[in-house]
Amino acid sequence: MKRRAPIAAALSFAAFASIVPTATAQSQNLVIIDQDGFKSEISGSQTGYQLSLSAKQRGYEQGIRAIQDGARHVATIRQYGRDNGAAFNQSGRRNSGFLGQAGFYNSAAINQAGRGNLAGVAQMGRGNSASTNQTGSYSALGVVQVGDGHAAEVTQSERGEVKLVIQGLNLFRW
């Protein structure tokens, strides 16, 4: 009985930690999240300077939400499966983010506010959608969708903006 108590405590802590949002408020921190399954959700929030967040999900009907406030942040989100949704919001200067999805009927949303930000969306499969919004000057974004039935919405305001949208490429054959 005494040996089972630490194991039960560790398992309950692991279960609790998998649903608690991740938050940091310093500089040069890194958060890495890797999740498999069905109907899971990841929520991360970072405030500070030069922070990194990397999240990966495999499965279906999953969601990722990341929020970064400050400067020089990096967000990388990858999802594999179907009916998944991912979004990240970044505010500040010189932030960058990448959102990649492979599968069917996935949705991606990026919102960046500030100066000198960079955003990228890559989707492969069928029926995926992407929405990107950048407010601020001297920012760039790119959307690449490979497969059929995709939708993309790109909104940029201010000056010095660069955007690239590529849609409808056939699936690559190796």
Per-range role (PLM):
Residues K2-P6, S12, T24-S45, G120-W174:
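Long terminal segments
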Residues A10-S18:
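Bacterial N-terminal signal peptides
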Residues V20-T22:
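Polar/acidic, low-complexity leader/linker segments enriched in S/T/G and N/D
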Residues K39-E41, Q50-S52, G100, N111:
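Glycine- and aspartate-rich repeat motifs characteristic of hemolysin/RTX-like Ca2+-binding segments
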Residues Q46-G81:
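N-terminal, post-signal-peptide region of Sec/Tat-exported proteins
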Residues A55, I77, F88, L99, ...:
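A short, polar/proline- and glycine-enriched secondary-structure boundary/capping micro-motif
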Residues G85-V144:
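Surface-exposed, polar helix/loop patches in the mature regions of secreted/periplasmic/lumenal proteins
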